[in-house]
Each structure stands twice: as C-alpha cells, then as structure tokens.
Amino acid sequence: MKIHEYQAKAILAQYKVPVPRGHVAYTEADAETAAKTLGGSVVVKAQIHAGGRGKGGGVKVAKDAAEALELAKKILGMTLVTHQTGPEGRLVQRLLIEETLPIERELYLGIVLDRVQGKPVFMASSAGGMDIEEVAAKTPELILKETLEYPGLSPYQARKLAFGIGIPAASVNAAAAAMTALSKAYWAMDASLAEINPFILTTDGKVYALDAKITFDDNALYRHKELVELRDLNEEDPLEVEASKHGLNYIKLDGTVGCMVNGAGLAMATMDIIKFAGGSPANFLDVGGGANAEQVKNAFRILLSDHSVKAVLINIFGGILRCDTLATGVVAAARDLNIQVPIVVRMEGTNVEAGRQILLESGFNFTVGADMWDAAQKVVKLAA
C-alpha cells in the first residue's frame, strides 16, 4: 500500500526524523491559510502516488501566501503527468504546503528488501534529488549499502554511511540519528520501501527529509489498522480496488488479452507466453487456489470492465480450485454479463473432464486450448 508524501513525513516525524514544517491543503483557501501560518516563502507540492512531480509541474515555490494561492489554483485539479503515472496522469486533489529551507547538499537515503540476501538493505548516496535507479545504472559506486538487522541500523553503521556520503563531522550525529530513525520506522511499520530523496543538509548544518516515500506490505496491514486509514482509493485503479474487495489479485496492464489464472506463478507464465505468441496481456488476475464460482464470476466482471480487452484466456490448473468449479463460474458469468469477447479456455487437473463437459453443454462458443502454447496462439489471434 502506498501513501502520500505528507503522510510519510508524519510517520517519520513520529520516529524523530527531522522534516520541514508543513500543512496539507485540500482547497485553495487551505493553501493560502497554510502559507500564511508558515510565513515567508513556501513550496506548493502536488500530492499524488507518483514520483517526478517537479518535472511535471507539480512542485512550485511561492514567495508569499498570495503567490501560494495562485499556484494552488493552477495545481489543484490539474492532471499531473510524470514518468511514473503514464500518459493518462493523475488528478491532483490535495497539496502539501511546506516551508522552504536553505539547501547546502542533496543526498539520498532508502531501505528496500534485498531478495538475494533475504534481508533489508539500507542505501545511502551523495547523489540525491534524482532517480536512484539512474544513479545505480550509471554510477553505482555512489551508492553505499549496509544490511539491516532487527530492530534497525546500528550506530556504527549509521556513522559509517554518514561519513561515506560526505556529511561534515559537525552534522554526522544528526544524520546518523535520522538514518537510525528511518530504519526503525521501516521495521516497526512493516514497510517494503522507505525512501528519503532528497535528504538534505542545510547551510546551517541541519538535516531534513525534504521528500519521503513509504510503501507498506499489504499482507501485514492487519497489524496496522492506523495505516489502513491512510489509504487513498482515489490514487488506485478502480478495478484493482474492486478486485481487492473480493479477495482477488488483479493488476491492470496495457494489453488486449484478458487473463484469468489460478496461482501467481502460472499467471506470470501465462503473461509471458502471451507475449511470446505476439500478444500483450491486459491484466494480471490470480483468482487464487480456493476460489468459488461466485469469485470466478466477480473476476470475470472485473476483467471485462476493462474495455481494452479484446479476448480472454482462462488458464487453470485444477487443484484446490477444481476445474468444474471454475467452469461453473465461467458459465454463470457468461450468462449474467452478456459477454461479447471470445474466450479461450485451457484447463488441466482435478475434475478437468467434468469442467470441459460443463463448458461444452453451456451453449456458449468457448474455444478450448489443447495446451498453454496452443491456447496462447489462439487467444492472440482472436484479440488481433
């Protein structure tokens, strides 16, 4: 689960990471009031779940409250397009009005899971204020790493990183404290990503999290009811939100071949084979091993709500989800939803013959794939 910058900063502040003074604004009047409260020049920052906001025109500096009001009028309600939003962009519905700070240097701090080690890794770099992926690709030597152990970064690791990215001796303790606090927040909140970019050093030697991003492990949210309340459904794809209500794992993609599969591994393999056959998947949809006919019907309804879908591939290996259960749900969906796109079905496993018989006797013109490759070729041809 993603949250907004201002929400991430509020969490970091609870763990004693220094953040600039700021206020969230939902209206133009809120923005003006916030700017007056802060006094002096302020930064007006669009709040969406995507990076690259500055380059897209979503971050502007105002010299006073009057200019902040004018900027708020322009940014609130705009569709902000960045390299992470795609061409459709995101509607800006809230702003962060924040004090400006005298920046001496921009640095980077971040924590992600190292899948090779199976442990979180703390990264720090002197190249802050830019995409860390670009830094990693072009100048990987600028990224320093320390493996994390519970409950967080040790004092010697924090100081090592602080000195390593060129923090002056007078500011090392403050920077190390912020790093340690960030690592503790990561552990305590069951985060999958915690990032401060840029982490700044001011002209008077202080450090601040000038921007912050935290992503949480969805599977751990049951332990953090307070985090669930931070979820902004307006920032999520409506179909993905609807799928989550029915216990379905759905991610919308840009292709034309709709996919319904049981099991994440088989779902990814299905998308791969569709690409290999010359097509493009419209979604990732894992109905899970324990799905019933009603869930299958809901999955179909969600899948077909995407009007870019020109054909559907159902790829099921019957285990806990028996093939006859899947077929019953598919037929029910076809009857209730007035399906107009061609459907290719490939089933193997428990009760496969019964499942095929249900499809055969349904009266609908389902295309049967002999195997995955045959099914992929057929569905790509039908979607063309």
Curated annotation (Swiss-Prot):
Sequence ranges assigned to domain ATP-grasp in this UniProt record: 9-242
Short name of any one Pfam family annotated for the protein: Ligase_CoA
Cofactor field: Mg(2+)
GO terms of molecular function: ATP binding; magnesium ion binding; succinate-CoA ligase (ADP-forming) activity; succinate-CoA ligase (GDP-forming) activity
Pathway where this protein functions: Carbohydrate metabolism; tricarboxylic acid cycle; succinate from succinyl-CoA (ligase route): step 1/1
Keyword Nucleotide-binding: yes
Enzyme Commission number(s): 6.2.1.5
UniProt: ATP binding residues: K45, G52, R53, G54, E98, L101, E106
Manner of cofactor binding, per the entry note: Binds 1 Mg(2+) ion per subunit.
GO biological-process terms attached to the record: succinyl-CoA metabolic process; tricarboxylic acid cycle
Residues engaged in binding substrate: N262, G319, I320, L321
Binding site for Mg(2+): N197, D211
Subunit structure: Heterotetramer of two alpha and two beta subunits.
NCBIfam families, alphabetized: PRK00696.1, sucCoAbeta
HAMAP family: Succ_CoA_beta (MF_00558)
PANTHER family per record: SUCCINATE--COA LIGASE [GDP-FORMING] SUBUNIT BETA, MITOCHONDRIAL, SUCCINYL-COA SYNTHETASE BETA CHAIN
Protein name: Succinate--CoA ligase [ADP-forming] subunit beta
